A protein has these predicted regions:
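Iron-sulfur cluster-binding electron-transfer modules in prokaryotic oxidoreductases
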Residues: 1-167
């Protein structure tokens, strides 16, 4: 089972724990947990992609979403995958800190979410990237509210580098 949204993937990987006391769902939930992988995790480990060179090498700042790095324990795989495009993939300073999205956190705790966003954007912009990449839709929305630097889902970049349209 492949997930291209880190929050959903984290939840599916946690089904075994969530349903551990449910006699009807326990075994099925455990199977789902064991089969679930983030799409970047799977692609990095299982496929040799044929990347097409571009006229320019880009600087990509990779934001590891909380649900990805803390929930799924997937951190280096998306960056390794992006590095195969022959671009410069940069880890954001203080990358372990939330961007302020956190599901509904940016709606329920707007002041703190804005402070986290400002800190994240400052750290991103210190790298002077051509664009930002992440695997979480909420983070894409949150970070795009604080910067003019384009932010793309990791799979959008990989699609472009395997012959798809420029995002």
């Amino acid at each position: 089972i492949l997930s291209n949204t880190s929050g959903c993937g984290t939840t599916m990987k946690d089904y075994g724990f969530i349903f551990k006391d449910d006699k009807k769902m326990k075994k099925k939930a455990k199977v789902i947990s064991e089969l679930t992988r983030d799409v970047s995790e799977y692609l990095n480990e299982n496929l040799k992609l044929n990347f097409k060179s571009k006229d320019k090498k880009y600087k990509i700042a990779y934001h590891s979403a909380c649900s990805m790095q803390h929930g799924q324990k997937v951190h280096s795989q998306p960056m390794q995958l992006l590095s195969k495009t022959d671009n410069e993939v940069m880890e954001i300073p203080e990358g372990h800190i939330c961007c302020g999205s956190a599901g509904t956190y940016n709606i329920l705790q707007t002041k703190i979410a804005k402070e986290l966003l400002n800190k994240k954007v400052k750290n991103i912009e210190s790298l002077k990237p051509d664009f930002i990449s992440t695997g979480n839709i909420g983070c894409i929305t949150q970070i795009s509210n604080g910067t003019k630097t384009p932010i793309l889902h990791t799979i959008e970049i990989l699609d472009w580098y395997t012959g798809g349209p420029k995002p």
